[in-house]
């Protein structure tokens, strides 16, 4: 009894503390770009969308309808669902094994970093995990005896999963296969009540199927074809290391051992959990050798780990005490690391410290200063000005910040890459060119950092073809330009004339991260198609420290970008001598101020240098 009370107290204490931490993070963390698009979908209610079934969008709509247009309100339904998951795991485990193991399984549901952080973001995984647990619970009950309540729970779980994500098909397929492998499962599947539940769950896929039938299978093609190479690549071998790191190494081993130990358990429920969990994880492992490696996919196996959690306490009981302590400690560290990442992403000063690094949270950063700049510029423009974004990310994030779910978006590779182009087209928000807006003035928002440098000139010239020559932009550099936006105020009519684009530049010397003395040289190139540049200034920590000699021979940019028509080619090189002897040693940020012949002033992205003494 004392052991049970002790386990329960630890569970309740961690649950309350974790929920409080997640509420604070959900209130402070800027919206991830996918969350912003789900909000936009929620403002255009439908049964299904180009990227997902409808449930995630409906939940975002519910959140903001009840709590207002804030990040916490948007995420609140997901937080509530995520808060229920440890209790559900504890309940399932206690019923099938014992109460002490139930509290411990629930505790490790929170310590498992991928599960413990659910709800901080308004993404489908919270509901998909909830659906997995409902189906697990129903399946376990059906293995003992078929009842109307178990069949009803199965129906609700299957329908919830179908309305959550395409990936639930993996859970559905594996769960059905495992039930077929068990004699008790085959008996349950023959019962009419279970057949009705399965039919109800399958019917829940109807909205998604109907959407695809009406839109040339655009959603299916994106999820199953377009985003995956479907050719073997060795990157899938990183799956085990990545998952071991995310789950935390000892907990990962313990979960796999749980599956192995119970694979032939005399208890059908234990075998059911073991095979359900390991086959889901193994399936995604195999898929990793053929599937998409560019987008985030590390969370895909989560339903498999959740299925193994009820088996975990019995395995850990057999481990030495020091190993159990190490497992718990590592899991706590992993959970804190993931929560810490979200915390750092929510604090501009901390986020700026990793600007330019691989771990920089691009999809969380810059939206608040961008919205402030858009509001400011829009206030100086005519009342009938229309905002247009060059990609869906900026359109959705600005839409949430400004309370406008109908910001038009130009064609962009990102819209296609993330499967959002068909949905924008259905909403009538895909602005092909200037004619989409009639005679309205435009405030064009361009995410310059969303396009690789090698592709920027082509992207800028494509903007010219759609909207005409671009006027001098207002530059919004966030975190030293790791996120860089350009704002253009366009008149009502498409102007004639040659294409004028934003400036481009590169610093060849010193390179980012180089160590430099108190005095050092800066060299590189810069150009601005259509009009050219008049001057280049060198900045340190945002302040001018030198005027560069501009107009040196450098044929490289024109050779690399034949499309470029800066009138100064090939004399687009620059060099300057910087005296930073009065500055403190340590890390500083080196940047450029590019002055165009059209009067534009554009600050280029900064790069770090280390001044040594």
Summary of predicted features, one role per range:
Residues 12, 76-97, 134, 138:
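Transmembrane-helix motifs of polytopic, lipid-linked glycan transferases
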Residues 15, 105-113, 137, 158, ...:
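Short helix- or helix-capping micro-motifs
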Residues 44, 138, 150-165, 176-177, ...:
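Membrane-interface alpha helices of multi-pass inner-membrane proteins
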Residues 94-100, 135-153:
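Membrane-interface transmembrane helices that cradle and orient dolichyl/undecaprenyl
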Residues 114, 120-128:
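Short acidic/glycine- and proline-prone juxtamembrane loop motifs at membrane-interface regions
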Residues 171-270, 276, 280, 284-291:
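Transmembrane-lumen/periplasm boundary regions of multi-pass, lipid-linked membrane glycan transferases
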Residues 317-351:
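Signature aromatic-anchored transmembrane alpha helix within multi-pass, membrane-resident enzymes
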Residues 358-497:
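Luminal/periplasmic acceptor-recognition loop/helix of membrane-associated glycosyltransferases
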